[in-house]
A protein has these predicted regions:
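Eukaryotic tandem repeat interaction scaffolds
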Residues: 171, 178-290
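Inward-facing hydrophobic residues that define packing positions of alpha-helical scaffold repeats
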Residues: 10, 30, 50, 70, ...
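Single-residue signature of alpha-solenoid repeat helices
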Residues: 26, 66, 106, 146, ...
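Amphipathic alpha-helical segments of tetratricopeptide repeats
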Residues: 34-35, 71-82, 111-122, 151-161, ...
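C-terminal non-catalytic interaction modules
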Residues: 13, 276, 280-369, 373-375, ...
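Amphipathic alpha-helices of TPR/Sel1-like and other helical repeat/solenoid scaffolds
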Residues: 1-2, 9, 16, 20-40, ...
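Tandem amphipathic alpha-helical repeat scaffolds
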Residues: 7-22, 45-61, 85-101, 125-141, ...
Length: 411
């Protein structure tokens, strides 16, 4: 039913790269081809090669390089009059914005990318952009709003036999069930995702599915050793492909498994390691979750209750500000578990303020998809105005706080 997984973001002369190519190889080959295309004045090829370069930088956590690359890819696509290539560049930029915690900016860029994908007749970039919008909502905990979109995208991916996109959708739906307490349903979905990914030779998707299975085996069954074994298997793929972000999340999950088993010194070590990795790559969500695990471990090891309460209260405020609903709920559960009162209760209905990434890099809001003119030319003009405004603002400086907006490394 499913063919071998492929990477549609590797285009033009780079279609020989596979979904399992190491990011270092993608960056080297992409940069070489990009330079050749620029020297030859081949705008279409420059846009395509530039997209691969942008994605490699993004997944390696190199925010400034990724920021420059997606904008350059967009400009090359615009100069070539290639609306679909413009959409791919905006998809890359929107994904980068989401990973930096700039959720509103991410939604605008991804929404525009989906529209241009439809205008340009590229159903793949449209699907990827809609998936990006769905993932943005899921990360923020808005399950009701994006659950149906996940199901719709899963149905479309199954119908087309797209293994990679099917695996992504299954894992997203599984994670929502996991976070809602439906462990059995989540396990079945992660198991199916792992099976499809393995058959399609999608090592990245397989590693994420194994991580999800390990989480449930630990939380539901209390089977620590099996969970650690699944994480070890996933880590092999992460290291082989230099998947820094997936590896950091693997280490954080290993900390979760050890914490649940009461092995607090080991959990502290893993959370500390993951925290350093997330800070190095600028992944604010992973950084916050690692801090939470570390705080809980230190509390179990005898840390002063007042210090624990202060740390949890700070995390609650930060997560409230950047709009990560599920993570805020996790902090509240930790406060209850450890018997500490929140210094300042979080307000669930508070509207998140702009993150530093949004304040420093936000583009003027493009018109909603339904309000845009229906011609490719007008859509291209709208995209051009939005992307060019964005391109005038450099990426924000990295910081080391939870809300620091260096690029995250995503899937």
């Amino acid at each position: 039913m499913y063919g071998k997984a492929f990477a549609p973001e590797y285009q033009g002369a780079l279609t020989t790269l596979s979904v399992n190519s190491s990011l270092d190889d993608v960056l080297a080959v992409g940069t070489e081809r990009l330079r050749a295309a620029e020297q030859a004045g081949e705008h279409v090829e420059a846009a395509r090669s530039g997209l691969a370069v942008a994605e490699a930088h993004r997944r390696l956590g190199q925010v400034r390089e990724a920021d420059r690359a997606w904008k350059a890819s967009y400009r090359a696509a615009r100069d070539a009059g290639d609306v679909a290539a413009m959409a791919w560049a905006l998809w890359s930029g929107g994904t980068l914005a989401r990973q930096r915690g700039a959720f509103r900016l991410a939604r605008r860029l991804l929404g525009l990318a989906a529209e241009l994908g439809e205008q340009g007749g590229d159903i793949v970039v449209r699907g990827y952009s809609l998936a990006g919008l769905a993932e943005t909502g899921r990360i923020q905990g808005d399950y009701e709003a994006v659950g149906r979109l996940h199901e719709q995208l899963l149905a479309e991916a199954r119908r087309r036999g797209e293994a990679r996109h099917t695996v992504w959708a299954l894992e997203g739906i599984a994670q929502m069930h996991r976070n809602s307490g439906a462990h059995d349903t989540a396990y079945a979905l992660f198991e199916e995702a792992a099976r499809i990914a393995e058959g399609a030779e999608d090592r990245r998707g397989h590693a994420w599915a194994l991580r999800g299975l390990a989480d449930i085996v630990s939380a539901r069954d209390g089977d620590t050793e099996r969970a650690l074994g699944l994480l070890t298997e996933a880590e092999e793929s992460c290291r082989a492909m230099n998947l820094s972000g997936a590896l950091a999340y693997n280490h954080k999950m290993r900390g979760n498994v050890l914490y649940r088993a009461g092995r607090y010194p080991e959990a502290r070590q893993l959370y500390t390691q993951a925290l350093g990795e997330f800070r190095a790559m600028g992944e604010p969500r992973g950084e916050a979750l690692s801090r939470l695990g570390l705080t809980k471990s230190l509390a179990r090891l005898g840390r002063d209750r007042a210090e624990t309460a202060a740390e949890l209260a700070e995390l609650a405020r930060e997560l409230e500000r950047i709009g990560l609903r599920h993570a805020r709920e996790m902090v509240a559960r930790a406060q209850n578990e450890l018997g500490v009162e929140p210094a300042t209760p979080a307000t669930a209905t508070q509207t998140p303020t702009s993150t530093p990434a949004e304040a420093g890099a936000e583009a003027p809001a493009p018109a909603p998809a339904q309000a845009q003119a229906s011609t490719p030319a007008s859509a291209s003009a709208s995209a051009s105005a939005s992307a060019e405004a964005q391109a005038q603002t450099p990426a924000p400086e990295p910081t080391t706080t939870v809300s620091g907006e260096r690029a995250a490394v995503a899937r």
